[in-house]
Structures are given as C-alpha cells and as structure tokens.
Design a protein with these regions (language model features):
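Alpha-helical cap/lid subdomain in secreted, periplasmic
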Residues: 1-123
Length: 123
C-alpha cells in the first residue's frame, strides 16, 4: 500500500524516485497510481481523515512533478468514493469487504480497461 501506509511527507520524499526507478527498469510499462480510499473511520477520527486527505494531495502533487519531468505512460486515478457512501463497503471502517472490493472494481475497471487496452469478460 504505497499511499495509505507512508506519511504524506514520506510520499513526497519517495514517490518520484520510486516511479523513476520503475520507469528506468521498465520503460514501456504503464504505471497506474491510485489515490488511497476515503475510509469510514475518518467520519469519527478527524486526524485520520486529515491524514488521508494529505496523503492523497501529496501523491497528486508528485504525479504532477512526474508529468512535468516528462514521464510517459503514467496514469492517475483520483479517489472517487470507491467504497460507496452507505457505510457498507468495509469490514471494520478501514478494510474493504466483498461489497467494497466489488465497488472498487466497478470504479477502477473503465480506466484500467482503457489504459491497458483490454476488455474484461463481462464487457
């Protein structure tokens, strides 16, 4: 989990170097960066909510740095209530359950299908 586990500061310090290393070893491989999930726990823990907000802002800023450096084949998916808004998408307020993963798939699939130029069996 390269976005939810490090601090915003660590994301700022490490993301560009990580992507540049990956790009050096795999120059043509698409790199997809996805912001971290907005978690239910943030409804009750303002510190956690603010941390997720800062993590997502930090990775968005680093994606812009990478784009300005001319990194090609780099894609960014912004958090879009991936788990839904009915409080049913996690097992514990943090980790997705089956419903949460299904919702994430439905949000990610169109972008991934377009980026990788693939069709999923159910399309």
């Amino acid at each position: 989990d390269c976005i939810p586990n490090p601090s915003p500061k660590e994301i700022t310090e490490r993301a560009v170097g990580f992507v540049m290393t990956l790009r050096e070893k795999h120059p043509d491989t698409p790199i997809i960066i996805i912001q971290t999930l907005i978690r239910e726990t943030g409804n009750f823990n303002q510190k956690a909510r603010e941390n997720v907000k800062q993590q997502n802002e930090a990775i968005a800023e680093q994606v812009e740095v990478l784009r300005k450096k001319g990194v090609k084949n780099l894609y960014f998916i912004k958090e879009d209530r991936f788990l839904g808004t009915d409080h049913e998408g996690t097992i514990d307020g943090t980790h997705p359950n089956d419903l949460g993963f299904d919702r994430m798939l439905k949000k990610y699939k169109p972008a991934i299908s377009k980026i990788l130029k693939i069709k999923f069996r159910d399309e």
